[in-house]
Amino acid sequence: MVQIVSCTQPVTHEVEPDHGSPTAADQGLIGGRGASSRVGVRPMQVAVVGQGYVGLPLALHAAAAGHHVIGFDTDRAKVDGLKSGRSPIEDVADNALQSALSGGRYRPSSRPRDLVGFDIAVIAVPTPLADGEPDLAFIRAAGRLVGVHLRAGALVVLESTSYPGTTQILGDVLESASGLKRGADFGLGFSPERIDPGNQQWTVATTPKVVSGIDTVSLARVAEFYAGLVDRVVLVDRCEEAELAKLLENTFRAVNIAVVNELAEIARRAGVDFRRALAAAASKPFGFMAFDPGPGVGGHCLPVDPIYLSWWAEQHAGGRSALIDLAAQINNSRPAQVVERLALSLCARGRDLAGAQILLLGLSYKPGSGDIRESPAVEVAQLLTARGARVVACDPFVPASAATGIVLIEDLSLEVAAADAVVVLTDHDCFDYDRIAAEAAFVFDCRGRVAASSTVEQL
């Protein structure tokens, strides 16, 4: 069933599986995963450039749907691990990777020549910051790599998060490398990744997929490809709109987290329990969305995407977004606030931060995940160490090899009672918070998991 939502604004189309009578969706023109499974996916040669948190799950989904997939990455060590059946990310189990390898439809490679002959190339590479500004170096490099092997009739899709206009920049790179013209010789589109590491409910298949193209033909081809992989496809008329949509999603979240972080600090100074106020506000069934205060934001998206958006505003609207920049400043200041608050609390208990034994619970940026990219918990650990504290951390999701310079422990039984302070930074459900509160001399809770008491203080 193809649903068209009409309004005074540019039209957005939502494409879902139709389980009724035959329609255009059933004929394989556009459809969700359900429709495609009835008519069968036309097997294609698919190259997914970048085999990380975004590219690897997508590559395996494409292989499972019947495509022949090259999972390309310039990291040879990562590719060697993939070839041996060792997944580098938690969202892909080793046995799932091994099954894809044994099925013969997924082949990891670091050799550019293996990209020859692709029908569809999906680019899923990092988009970091360089000196506080967007860095498209990985996209440009991937575009040159893909462009060398681009042939007439192929389709290129960008999934990397970036500012509006990036897909057209990629198009310039592809044209320069291939000698072909986008639209006339090859298709080009943008479909923003929406990966949430560790989320078992919203996966590649179940999360609605926004798709766009530089023209109607490209849009239809992008939609057809993803309709064979996911439950619902959302068509957006222009790539720039889809690019802005992704930045809007994460900027909305980052700004609202900054609001509650700021209000939590104001409420603390005024002697008001902010979390109780937040719970009361969340009882309103309309017009309110609850966000939790914490030690900062992490992951590849939230610390970076708002900066891309504010930079884009400066380039095209006459100035940066003061709201977005202030939100980033508030969120970025939280790790230092945690350390300063902890130092003051220890001082009030007759203990200096320098030389204190500090146990950190959680290093990843979110519960249930081992992803420490841009994690505020890691920054807290580094700041504490710089202040002379003796820091150990426990995070069952984070391998010791990932936590460079931080001592990771597995057994909490002796460390909790021995610590001058236990700091809850990532609220993994596997921690026994009641027992920790009972055994610890002092708990500094940044996540609201332990009830405040004479020995428990909340951020």
Each language-model region and where it sits:
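Short, intrinsically disordered low-complexity segments enriched in Ser/Thr with adjacent Pro
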Residues: Q9-S21
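Structural/interface elements that position substrates and couple domains in central-metabolism enzymes
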Residues: V2-C7, G34-L459
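Low-complexity, intrinsically disordered segments with a bias for serine/threonine
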Residues: P10-V11, A25, G40
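Compositionally biased low-complexity segments, especially N-terminal hydrophobic helices
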Residues: Q3, H19-A24
